């Protein structure tokens, strides 16, 4: 496959340096991914909530055909047996392509085989063959990429997948009517393993997986910085300390025992010790931050005994470069832990896990600490790869005054599951109450600048000093509020708390704005945003400057409402 210009430059050099570092350490760590794409402008159910229907099969065929053309391989198109989930009347489609690794040429059969060819079983994994599939999931089509032996080949494969999706009219992201950007609606999982199950680094170095689990648990940025909108216990990838307390305590015991046994740990023992504990609150092994279903799972046959570990707390990246950077990050963490597995005990985060680590500022700090640690242990990420990890949208609001900068950014919110957990096991998605939003208020002050006050809907935001950046102080607060009234949902009678009125009192002045969730003038939007530029304009239009002198005076919230430091408007009188 001929490399396109987007893979040139500093990024490619850093990717090659990364591969050279792992080769020098004799670490063989293959990479897999399952990028998901959607029809961004469509409001049809198969591109929102349903797995199949409409044009999804047609678009899946277009995507696979375009990807095989991008790769330039002599693939054989295969109509394979797809998965069938509880409650579904028939298996989902599975569009496959099979070829010999390292070969080049044109497809050996017609793409029509994907419609009228014989129905074949999915082939068993083989190190000399590549197997690529396109399958449906709710709202998206998923591309299951063949494993790559190094980051450079993963870069080529990822960029080809994104180009093919664009050719097929599919997108890795969506925009809501109000301009909010989100991912495709599917996941962006990364899988690591070896060329064969026996050569998996998780079996060759049995201490690696326990060390990875400790490392991730001690660095919440790895759980949240790249996650989707739904995080926490009801998400697709909850942390071990977000589930049942007893399981987390037992995980500490299992990790101690595995590490004490060192190289004597067998694949059976490794999987058997961890699989019952790496699950969500209902015991679902698929919904876990670190998924070991295909590590050494005899219940799934050969496909479950593959030596693979999947990292699931990852949203679909907007660009192939970001996907490659995330893969490089987790690959580097594994490489660091192969030779230096001691990272310390599991941490008791308590309420800080869903308070402090909900805020972008702390996640950025922790992620930088991870990168510093990797560099200290000889597996650094270059500046271009690192920059991809910190890519983010502009703040919702930014205001400047002499010696001061005020920014408001979206923060994470941990949406609760509705009803009995077990009763939702047959659904394609969990039913949560997503009506609560959290914002980070960040005030950066030059030396000697008075703090002033920030008010939200008449209540003072509990700004706390959290860091010094050179001569500057950084103060943070969080605000939680109900954005809309869901049905079904929690807290009947609690109305939507918007628009949010923001007032900044600084050096005797009051600057105000109203932050709307929808068009300030009301009424429907004509259609979805055409592109990222129009989406950004709609977001800007929802923040309306107002005369600060007309807004109510700021008063402190009652004791018990401001915690860690969060102002929860849902717990305050609605009249401000």
Name these PLM-found stretches.
Residues 1-184, 195-576:
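C-terminal accessory/tail domains of diverse enzymes
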């Amino acid at each position: 496959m001929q490399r396109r210009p987007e893979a040139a430059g500093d990024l490619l050099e850093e990717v090659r340096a990364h591969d050279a570092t792992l080769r020098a350490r004799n670490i063989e760590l293959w990479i897999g991914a399952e990028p998901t794409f959607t029809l961004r402008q469509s409001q049809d159910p198969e591109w929102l909530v349903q797995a199949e229907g409409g044009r999804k099969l047609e678009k899946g065929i277009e995507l696979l055909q375009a990807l095989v053309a991008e790769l330039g391989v002599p693939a054989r198109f295969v109509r394979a047996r797809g998965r069938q989930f509880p409650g579904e009347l028939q298996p989902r489609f599975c569009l496959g392509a099979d070829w010999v690794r390292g070969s080049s040429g044109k497809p050996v059969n017609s793409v029509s085989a994907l419609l009228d060819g014989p129905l074949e079983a999915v082939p068993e994994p083989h190190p000399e063959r590549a197997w690529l599939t396109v399958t449906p999931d709710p709202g998206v089509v998923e591309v299951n990429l063949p494993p790559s032996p190094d980051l450079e080949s993963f870069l080529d494969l990822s960029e080809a997948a994104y180009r093919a999706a664009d050719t097929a009219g599919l997108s890795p992201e969506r925009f809501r009517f109000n301009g909010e950007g989100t991912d495709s609606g599917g996941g962006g999982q990364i899988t690591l393993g070896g060329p064969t199950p026996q050569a998996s680094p998780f079996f060759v170095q049995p201490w690696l997986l326990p060390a990875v689990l400790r490392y991730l648990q001690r660095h919440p940025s790895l759980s949240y910085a790249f996650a989707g909108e739904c995080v926490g216990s009801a998400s697709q990838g909850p942390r071990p300390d977000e589930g049942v307390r007893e399981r987390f305590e037992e995980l500490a015991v299992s990790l101690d025992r595995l590490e004490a046994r060192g190289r004597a740990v067998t694949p059976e023992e490794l999987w058997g010790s961890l699989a019952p504990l790496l699950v969500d609150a209902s015991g679902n092994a698929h919904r876990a931050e670190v998924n070991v279903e295909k590590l050494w799972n005899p219940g799934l046959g050969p496909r479950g005994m593959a030596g693979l570990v999947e990292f699931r707390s990852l949203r679909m990246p907007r660009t192939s470069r970001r996907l490659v950077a995330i893969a490089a990050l987790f690959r580097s963490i594994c490489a660091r832990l192969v030779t230096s597995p001691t990272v310390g005990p599991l941490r008791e985060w308590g309420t800080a896990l869903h308070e402090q680590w909900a805020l972008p500022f702390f996640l950025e700090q922790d992620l930088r600490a991870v990168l510093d640690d990797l560099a200290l242990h000889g597996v650094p990420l270059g500046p271009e790869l690192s920059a991809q990890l910190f890519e983010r949208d502009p703040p919702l609001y930014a205001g400047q005054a002499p010696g001061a900068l005020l920014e408001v950014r979206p923060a994470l919110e941990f949406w609760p599951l509705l009803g009995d957990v077990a009763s939702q096991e047959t659904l394609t998605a969990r039913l949560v109450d997503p009506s609560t939003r959290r914002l980070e208020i960040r005030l950066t002050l030059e030396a000697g600048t008075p703090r002033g006050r920030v008010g939200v809907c008449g209540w003072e935001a509990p700004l706390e000093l959290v860091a010094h950046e050179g001569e500057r102080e950084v103060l943070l607060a969080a605000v939680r509020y109900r954005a809309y009234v869901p049905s079904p949902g929690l807290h009947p009678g609690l109305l939507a708390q918007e628009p949010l009125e923001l007032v900044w009192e600084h050096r005797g002045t009051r600057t105000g704005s109203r932050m709307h969730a929808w068009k300030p003038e009301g009424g429907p939007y004509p259609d979805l945003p055409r592109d990222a530029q129009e989406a950004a304009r709609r977001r800007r239009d929802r923040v309306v400057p107002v005369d600060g002198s007309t807004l109510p005076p700021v008063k402190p919230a009652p004791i018990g409402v401001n915690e860690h430091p969060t102002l929860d408007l849902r717990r305050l009188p609605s009249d401000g």
